[in-house]
């Protein structure tokens, strides 16, 4: 039987506000760019082109994938590349640094499912450039791949 304390704790957890894209300025687009000083960043852009956020990247980025329900984005390295950074766009915090499996590279793009439970980054095998969609779960662990034939 559930105790009153456990019930109230669960109720508070469910009722607590969750971060949303509004917390990150409700960007319309994500874009990777080089700044005037030569640094690279992922930008959130409003409909009028104004920056809603700017998050630094360690090297040249190519594209970003926005999580459909949380203010998170994955910034992918320029193809072929070795980084995909999961960023909290509301706080600027690095959530996770994704590393492709041994012998694989990220290929600049990715997308979440509509529910946000799976991330599909475009990957390629370094030795022969054979293409794959990686399959990464909600904890950003790689759980599989699909060969693309490319």
Residue ranges and their predicted role:
Residues 1-23:
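N-terminal export signals
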Residues 18-45:
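C-terminal segment of N-terminal export signals and the immediately downstream linker at the start
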Residues 35-38, 78-80, 126-130:
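Short, solvent-exposed loop/turn segments at conserved positions within beta-propeller repeat blades
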Residues 46-48, 89-91, 137-139:
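Short loop/turn segments that connect beta-strands within beta-propeller blades
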Residues 50-56, 93-100, 142-147:
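A short beta-strand motif characteristic of beta-propeller blades
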Residues 59-66, 105-109, 150:
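Repeated scaffold domains used in trafficking and secretory/extracellular systems
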Residues 68-69, 114-115:
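Residue-level detector of Asp-centered blade-edge/turn motifs that repeat once per structural unit
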């Amino acid at each position: 039987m559930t105790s009153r304390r456990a019930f109230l704790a669960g109720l508070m957890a469910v009722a607590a506000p969750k971060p949303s894209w509004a917390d990150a300025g409700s960007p319309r687009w994500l874009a990777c760019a080089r700044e005037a000083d030569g640094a690279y960043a992922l930008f959130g852009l409003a409909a009028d082109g104004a920056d809603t956020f700017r998050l630094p990247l360690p090297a040249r980025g190519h594209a970003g994938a926005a999580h459909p329900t949380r203010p998170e984005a994955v910034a992918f390295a320029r193809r072929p590349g070795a980084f995909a950074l999961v960023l909290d766009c509301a706080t600027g915090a690095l959530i996770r640094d994704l590393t492709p499996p041994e012998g694989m590279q990220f290929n600049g793009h990715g997308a979440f499912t509509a529910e946000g439970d799976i991330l599909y980054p475009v990957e390629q095998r370094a030795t022969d450039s054979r293409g794959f969609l990686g399959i990464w779960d909600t904890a950003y662990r790689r759980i599989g791949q699909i060969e693309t034939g490319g």
